[in-house]
Amino acid sequence: MSTSRTPLSQQTPTAFGAPNPSLSDSAPVSAPTASTRPDRLSTVALVIFTSVYAFFFPLHLGHFLISEDAGPATGLALYIALFAVGCVAFRHPLARAAHQVAARKRRAVLTLIVGGLATLVIELIGGLASSALLNLAGLSGAILQNDASVAEVIQMFPPIIIIVVLGIVGPIVEEMFFRQFLIGLIERFAPTWVAVVVSSVLFGALHMHSFALSEVLSVIPHAFFGLSCGLLYVKTGRNLLYPASIHCLNNLSAFLPLLLH
């Protein structure tokens, strides 16, 4: 993986989280053109995407509108709809990311391999820390409610739906929100490392169903996984395709054994 020579904390993010190229002090500042500023369609789609996703998932406010019985099916449908809206909202950075990958295929494969191995190590560290803290708190064997809920959902729908929605669509939607959108947003007010850490903590909190100590400690591996994806996103020049691919592989590797059982 390659990094820019400019320190991350000194890079200026654009509206979609990609760093602006360096400008010399003597260069005249020109007004943004139609190709550099977000178009109206992207802006509207971004507002819809972030608002709907935040309402139903991180904030867990969907139960005010949807009955408990319809919750799982509605959640899967929302992921599909958000994926479509997100592709519109982030179509320009996604197109640039795809072009970068296509231009350097071997480098992209190597980046995925290194990124995947690094993610395994970071997630393992998070898992060990979680287990140690759970044992210290006398909560050994506690099961994260999110994992139990996912196991129930897997039994409710055909395998193809689980693979497509929870294995591919869902991870991409989460990467769009927590990496493409959230890191870029936080970078406007704080250094890049703060943006990565905060987005990772919030990603971990997404998997909590309560503030019980067992939930807080059990979600640590998820936060570490988010940290790995955030670092990969930043180190690859804000290319979302890398963390999204790692996220998809992570989910598929977890779901496939359950589907085959």
Where would I find each of the regions flagged by the language model?
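Alpha-helical transmembrane segments of multipass membrane proteins
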Residues: A54-L59, L82-G86, A118-G127, S199, ...
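Transmembrane helix-loop junctions in multipass membrane proteins, especially transporters and channels
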Residues: R91-R96, S131, N135-S140, M208-A212, ...
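Alpha-helical transmembrane segments
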Residues: R40-F57, V114-T119, V196-V198
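Alpha-helical transmembrane segments in multi-pass membrane proteins
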Residues: V44-R96, I143-A148
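Juxtamembrane helix-loop-helix connectors linking adjacent transmembrane helices
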Residues: E68-A70, A97-G170, R188
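Membrane-associated alpha-helix detector
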Residues: L41-Y53, G141-Q145, G167, F178, ...
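Low-complexity, intrinsically disordered extramembrane tails and loops of integral membrane proteins
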Residues: M1-P38
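Transmembrane helix-loop-helix hairpins at the membrane interface
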Residues: M156-H261
